[in-house]
From Swiss-Prot:
PROSITE patterns: PUA
A cellular component term, taken from the record's GO annotations: cytoplasm
Pfam families given in the database record: Methyltrans_SAM, PUA_3
Similarity field: Belongs to the methyltransferase superfamily. RlmI family.
Keyword rRNA processing: yes
Main localization of the protein described in the UniProt heading: cytoplasm
Gene that produces this protein: rlmI
Compartment(s) where it occurs, according to its Swiss-Prot or TrEMBL record: Cytoplasm
UniProt organism field: Aeromonas hydrophila subsp. hydrophila (strain ATCC 7966 / DSM 30187 / BCRC 13018 / CCUG 14551 / JCM 1027 / KCTC 2358 / NCIMB 9240 / NCTC 8049)
UniProt domain PUA: residue ranges: 2-79
Record-listed E.C. numbers: 2.1.1.191
Keywords for the protein's UniProt record, in alphabetical order: Cytoplasm, Methyltransferase, RNA-binding, rRNA processing, S-adenosyl-L-methionine, Transferase
Name listed for the protein in its UniProt record: Ribosomal RNA large subunit methyltransferase I
Reaction(s) catalysed (UniProt annotation): cytidine(1962) in 23S rRNA + S-adenosyl-L-methionine = 5-methylcytidine(1962) in 23S rRNA + S-adenosyl-L-homocysteine + H(+)
């Protein structure tokens, strides 16, 4: 018999709105002795059934909802149904954009809490981030093998958030082949990208920026472009395809820069007007400022500055500093494409930070576009935490 949890009176409101998390302070009592990952029944204080979820005794998020349907059991068929629906909901996008790399499963936003799956050609790369997904790892693997018999499955659960769930980090082959070399994917009608599945950031690449890379290209014709935190050069490739006269790609990782060069060459682009600079972005921007260098287009796509609420204030200072430096380097009429991937950073706050940065740089500016994550990274209407990537296209006078 499965364990049951009963909520503090009033704490059922978020579940009635179909939010998938139950925090430790929202639980009045537990009936039974669930182990981490166990499926538990969730009730109101007075015994009304609400949902069925996964228990995590180590996390502040004490349970994550698998289903709000009392008749739905969490078994192999459950995972096949959820993954099949996730795939079908993306099929139109895949066809329109010619994708061989896409996010197959966006965790809570696809009804599978703690499970992220990206597809790169014939490799499925999984991040298992919750006790519930960890507990169901074998069933998830079986479901993927049923739906994608042609694919190898590789795990990249080397993420610090697992510690909050009482889990150790883990990587390696779950099924099939090891991706010994970078895998080539295509996006946006034929743009080729090399993805280092084993050693790259996240699961290997930033699929969420796909639409924003394409959007950037329309600003680069005949322009001098500075691509900061370039990783493997995605924005740089699109800048060159858009007709940039010069592109400077900057990153701290030499391995990422090497792949960035390969990505440009893979797309048949002339790299004679392209630099691949290994440098700290903050320091380099200050050096450019001291030299009086100017750029027509600057891309700021930094790593996550805030992993927790305690880090948010420091993150705000970091975002303001780097955006101010960028405004100081923009030529008159220049365009800044700036992003935050910190889920804790609300859109309105990010917009205020960028506005304050322009003010401190002494520049009048206009927001031309508000940008977000690609649509294979959906945002559940009951799960606003799924909205994490914010972007602005800003023109400085």
């Amino acid at each position: 018999m499965s364990a049951s949890i009963y909520l503090v009176k009033g704490r059922e409101k978020s579940l009635l709105r179909r939010h998938p998390w139950i925090f430790s302070k929202g639980i009045e009592r537990v009936q039974g002795n669930p182990i981490d990952g166990d499926t538990v029944e969730i009730y109101t204080q007075d015994g009304k059934w609400l949902a069925r979820g996964a228990w995590s005794g180590s996390s502040q998020i004490r349970a994550r909802v698998w289903t709000f349907d009392k008749e739905e059991t969490v078994d192999l068929d459950f995972f096949i149904r959820r993954l099949k629906y996730a795939q079908e909901s993306r099929d139109g996008l895949i066809k329109r954009q010619g994708l061989t790399g896409y996010r197959l499963c966006a965790a809570e936003s696809d009804g599978l809490p703690g499970l992220t799956i990206d597809r790169y050609a014939d490799f499925l790369v999984c991040q298992i981030l919750s006790a519930g997904a960890e507990f169901q790892r074998d069933l998830i693997t079986q479901a993927l093998r049923t739906l994608y018999p042609e694919c190898s499955i590789y795990e990249r659960s080397d993420v610090a958030v697992r510690k909050k769930e009482g889990l150790k980090e883990r990587t390696g082959v779950i099924y099939g082949e090891t991706p010994t070399e970078p895998v080539v994917i295509e996006e946006n009608g034929g743009v080729k990208i090399l993805v280092d599945i084993r050693n790259g950031h996240k699961t290997g690449f930033y699929l969420d920026q796909r639409d924003n890379r394409q959007a950037a290209a329309k600003y680069t014709e005949g322009k001098r472009v500075l691509n900061c935190f370039c990783y493997t050069g995605g924005f740089g490739v699109y800048a060159l395809k858009g007709g940039a006269k010069e592109v400077v790609n900057v990153d701290l990782s030499q391995n990422a820069l090497d792949i960035a060069r390969q990505n440009a060459e893979l797309n048949g682009l002339d790299t004679s007007n392209t630099q691949f600079v290994r440098h700290d972005v903050f320091k380099l921007l200050r050096e450019y400022r001291e030299k009086g260098d100017k750029f027509d287009v600057i891309v700021l796509d930094p790593p996550k500055f805030a992993e927790s609420k305690a880090q948010l204030l420091g993150a705000c200072r970091g975002y303001k500093d780097i955006n101010m430096l960028a405004f100081q380097l923009l030529a008159p009429g220049g365009v800044l494409l700036t992003y935050s991937c910190s889920g804790l950073m609300e859109q309105s706050l990010f917009q205020k930070i960028v506005a304050d940065a322009a003010l401190d740089a002494g520049r009048d500016a206009q927001i031309l576009e508000l940008l977000s994550q690609a649509s294979d990274h959906p945002i559940g209407t009951a799960y606003p935490e799924g909205f994490y990537l914010k972007g602005l296209v800003v023109r400085a006078r």
